[in-house]
Amino acid sequence: MASSSGNDDDLTIPRAAINKMIKETLPNVRVANDARELVVNCCTEFIHLISSEANEICNKSEKKTISPEHVIQALESLGFGSYISEVKEVLQECKTVALKRRKASSRLENLGIPEEELLRQQQELFAKARQQQAELAQQEWLQMQQAAQQAQLAAASASASNQAGSSQDEEDDDDI
């Protein structure tokens, strides 16, 4: 098993991943912290064991990259043959997901439009959006100016009517 040196944290499964796995597997069971730590250590040791065996199989077949087949052979040689069917299912699911991702990323490439043309179209759309934004700002400014003018006219009108009322009162006082 791995020693408890400072570099071991880099060689273990993240604790959050183990906690999630435990919750999904045993949703109604409380698991003590030391039991969680034991699960982390067991998982880490299992991965080291399988990867070491897969590496040996890879080296024997004079390959430089460990393939899924090497991992499957390692499971078999270490006595974990009962896991192989499930491992193959998960491998197929992973390949399907990877293929979907590649297809999604290549959609842009398959449009048949060169990247320069796409960038030009994007710049046109940005320019159009800036123009629309400027027009909206101009309209808002004009509306504010009109509102200010109307407020000034209303204030001037009120002031004029107040002055006219004052003049009338003075004339009435003169008549007395």
From Swiss-Prot:
Q: Where is the composition biased (Low complexity)?
A: 152-167
Can you say where in the cell this protein is located? Answer: Nucleus
List the GO terms this entry assigns under cellular component, sorted alphabetically.
ATAC complex; mitotic spindle; negative cofactor 2 complex; nucleoplasm; RNA polymerase II transcription regulator complex
Keyword terms, alphabetized: Acetylation, DNA-binding, Nucleus, Phosphoprotein, Repressor, Transcription, Transcription regulation
Post-translationally, this protein is described as follows, namely:
Phosphorylation regulates its interaction with TBP. Not phosphorylated when bound to DRAP1.
Q: Which InterPro entries does its entry note?
A: CBFA_NFYB_domain (IPR003958), Histone-fold (IPR009072), Ncb2 (IPR042225)
- Region Disordered: what ranges? 152-176
| Motif residue range(s): Nuclear localization signal | 100-103
* Sequence positions bearing N-acetylalanine: A2
List the GO biological process terms. negative regulation of transcription by RNA polymerase II; regulation of cell cycle; regulation of cell division; regulation of DNA-templated transcription; regulation of embryonic development; regulation of transcription by RNA polymerase II; RNA polymerase II preinitiation complex assembly
* GO MF assignments: DNA binding; protein heterodimerization activity; RNA polymerase II general transcription initiation factor activity; TBP-class protein binding
**Keyword DNA-binding: yes or no?**
yes
Q: Which positions bear Phosphoserine?
A: S105, S106, S166, S167
First-listed, main subcellular location of the protein, grouped into a coarse class: nucleus
Keyword check for Phosphoprotein: yes
Using the record's annotation, list all stretches that form the Histone-fold domain: 12-75
Q: How does it assemble?
A: Heterodimer with DRAP1. DR1 exists in solution as a homotetramer that dissociates during interaction with TBP and then, after complexing with TBP, reassociates at a slow rate, to reconstitute the tetramer. Interacts with NFIL3. Component of the ADA2A-containing complex (ATAC), composed of KAT14, KAT2A, TADA2L, TADA3L, ZZ3, MBIP, WDR5, YEATS2, CCDC101 and DR1.
Q: What does this protein do?
A: The association of the DR1/DRAP1 heterodimer with TBP results in a functional repression of both activated and basal transcription of class II genes. This interaction precludes the formation of a transcription-competent complex by inhibiting the association of TFIIA and/or TFIIB with TBP. Can bind to DNA on its own. Component of the ATAC complex, a complex with histone acetyltransferase activity on histones H3 and H4.
Please state which protein family the record places this protein in: Belongs to the NC2 beta/DR1 family.
Protein name in the entry: Protein Dr1
Q: Which organism is it from?
A: Homo sapiens (Human)
Organism lineage reads as:
Eukaryota, Metazoa, Chordata, Craniata, Vertebrata
| Designated gene of the protein | DR1
